[in-house]
Amino acid sequence: MSSGALTKPQMRGLLAKRLRFHIVGAFAVSLGVAAFYKFAVAEPRKKAYADFYRNYDSMKDFEEMRKAGIFQSAK
């Protein structure tokens, strides 16, 4: 047993160090997911709604539904 003395492991601040690392990682992942959702889902949806309502004629749609007999009060 002539091996040198083993160095003691650091026991203080392990939780704080680990939490700091994981909080930074979680923040980066959440920003990435938010950016992905904005550009992959929200922007195309907003564009689709804008395209639809740009050419939408509510009176024409109302007249088609009235002729189909959907409304009871508008005959």
UniProtKB/Swiss-Prot annotation:
Q: Name one GO cellular component term.
A: mitochondrial inner membrane
Intracellular or extracellular location(s): Mitochondrion inner membrane
Asked if the record carries the keyword Transmembrane, the reply is: yes
Which branch of life, at top level?
Answer: Eukaryota
Q: Alphabetically, which GO biological process terms does the record hold?
A: oxidative phosphorylation
InterPro entries membership: Cytochrome_c_oxidase_VIc, Cytochrome_c_oxidase_VIc/VIIs, Cytochrome_c_oxidase_VIc_sf
Q: State the Gene3D superfamilies in the record.
A: Mitochondrial cytochrome c oxidase subunit VIc/VIIs
Q: Which CDD domains match?
A: CcO_VIc
Q: Where are the transmembrane segments?
A: 14-54
Q: Which residues lie on this side of the membrane: Mitochondrial matrix?
A: 1-13
Q: Which residues lie on this side of the membrane: Mitochondrial intermembrane?
A: 55-75
Q: What pathway does the UniProt record associate with this protein?
A: Energy metabolism; oxidative phosphorylation
Which keywords accompany this UniProt record? Membrane, Mitochondrion, Mitochondrion inner membrane, Transmembrane, Transmembrane helix
Query: Membrane topology for this entry?
Result: Single-pass membrane protein
One Pfam short name? COX6C
The family line of this record is: Belongs to the cytochrome c oxidase subunit 6c family.
Per UniProt, subunit arrangement is:
Component of the cytochrome c oxidase (complex IV, CIV), a multisubunit enzyme composed of 14 subunits. The complex is composed of a catalytic core of 3 subunits MT-CO1, MT-CO2 and MT-CO3, encoded in the mitochondrial DNA, and 11 supernumerary subunits COX4I, COX5A, COX5B, COX6A, COX6B, COX6C, COX7A, COX7B, COX7C, COX8 and NDUFA4, which are encoded in the nuclear genome.
Function field: Component of the cytochrome c oxidase, the last enzyme in the mitochondrial electron transport chain which drives oxidative phosphorylation. The respiratory chain contains 3 multisubunit complexes succinate dehydrogenase (complex II, CII), ubiquinol-cytochrome c oxidoreductase (cytochrome b-c1 complex, complex III, CIII) and cytochrome c oxidase (complex IV, CIV), that cooperate to transfer electrons derived from NADH and succinate to molecular oxygen, creating an electrochemical gradient over the inner membrane that drives transmembrane transport and the ATP synthase.
- Annotated protein name in UniProt: Cytochrome c oxidase subunit 6C
Origin organism is Carlito syrichta (Philippine tarsier)
Organism placement in taxonomy: Eukaryota, Metazoa, Chordata, Craniata, Vertebrata
Name the gene.
COX6C
